[in-house]
């Protein structure tokens, strides 16, 4: 965020801002890709980093996008008529909430890796980015405080500080995302962060339909809510045999 502010203000030798002169095709060295691959391997929804990587991939299709911009229609350009100062605050809060989600997901991945490799403590990992790193952040002090309060904390969003922070940002977050969608502005990280938050806070998700579909086309079985650990197969079409399993790993 600090360097972004500096970049936005930076002027070229001709007195004009430099940023609009830079080709909008982002490169990458692989750290984001490695993180996304690790998240998939460990089954952890690190969606923000994944979307950030894919957004760079999309940006690299510059020539295709130039052609697509001439053929694909979106919403008509809308002149913003609201309170700009108020909306800037909405964007600030949307950014803050999304940042919380990003760190939440990162520590979910670290937690899973710690379980896999038998790490006894991740305290050092919570502090290692505070300086000397491209993502150095004072924000990590709040994360350390959360785990100091509750060493067994399952998720940052369940800590009182972060829970209150996200709740305070929520209305602004939704307004910013909604405005972007209505005006056709791509916001992959804001939208996936909000989608993760809404998914995480729901007791029930439509994944039961996914399990039913998997059982329908592949007889993968599904677990019944009324019988935890009991997996069954349904003969959805009236044809074929039946399958049941108590040990299938869905």
UniProtKB/Swiss-Prot annotation:
SUPFAM superfamilies: 6-phosphogluconate dehydrogenase C-terminal domain-like
UniProt keyword list: Acetylation, Cytoplasm, Gluconate utilization, NADP, Oxidoreductase, Pentose shunt
Pfam families in the record: 6PGD
GO BP annotation list: D-gluconate metabolic process; pentose-phosphate shunt; pentose-phosphate shunt, oxidative branch
SMART domains named among the record's database cross-references: 6PGD
Function text: Catalyzes the oxidative decarboxylation of 6-phosphogluconate to ribulose 5-phosphate and CO(2), with concomitant reduction of NADP to NADPH.
Location, primary (coarse class): cytoplasm
Pathway: Carbohydrate degradation; pentose phosphate pathway; D-ribulose 5-phosphate from D-glucose 6-phosphate (oxidative stage): step 3/3
Name under which the protein is recorded: 6-phosphogluconate dehydrogenase, decarboxylating
GO molecular function, one term: NADP binding
Enzyme class: oxidoreductase
Residues where N6-acetyllysine is found: 77
Residue sites binding substrate per the record: 29, 56, 214, 220
GO cellular component labels: cytosol
Cellular location(s): Cytoplasm
Catalyzed reactions: 6-phospho-D-gluconate + NADP(+) = D-ribulose 5-phosphate + CO2 + NADPH
PROSITE patterns per record: 6PGD
Annotated NADP(+) binding sites: 245-248
Family: Belongs to the 6-phosphogluconate dehydrogenase family.
Subunit structure: Homodimer.
Its EC number(s): 1.1.1.44
């Amino acid at each position: 965020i600090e360097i972004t502010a500096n970049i936005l203000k930076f002027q070229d030798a001709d007195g004009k801002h430099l940023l609009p002169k830079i080709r909008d095709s982002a490169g990458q060295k692989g750290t984001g890709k490695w993180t996304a691959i690790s998240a998939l391997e460990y089954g952890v929804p690190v969606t923000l980093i994944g979307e950030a990587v894919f957004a760079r991939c999309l940006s690299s299709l510059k020539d295709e996008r130039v052609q697509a911009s001439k053929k694909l229609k979106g919403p008509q350009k809308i002149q913003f008529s609201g309170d700009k100062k108020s909306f800037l605050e909405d964007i600030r809060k949307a950014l803050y909430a999304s940042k919380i989600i990003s760190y939440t997901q990162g520590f979910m991945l670290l937690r899973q890796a710690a379980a896999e490799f038998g790490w006894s403590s991740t305290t050092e990992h919570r502090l290692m980015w505070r300086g000397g790193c491209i993502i150095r952040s004072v924000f990590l002090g709040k994360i350390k405080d959360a785990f100091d309060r509750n060493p067994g904390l399952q998720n940052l969003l369940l800590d009182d500080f972060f829970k209150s922070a996200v709740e305070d940002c929520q209305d602004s977050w939704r307004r910013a995302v909604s405005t972007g969608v209505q005006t056709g502005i791509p916001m992959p990280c804001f939208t996936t962060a909000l989608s993760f938050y809404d998914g995480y806070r729901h007791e029930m998700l439509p994944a039961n339909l996914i399990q039913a579909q998997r059982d329908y086309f592949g007889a993968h079985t599904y677990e019944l809510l009324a019988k935890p650990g009991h997996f069954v197969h349904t003969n959805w079409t009236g044809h074929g045999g039946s399958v049941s399993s108590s040990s299938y790993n869905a």
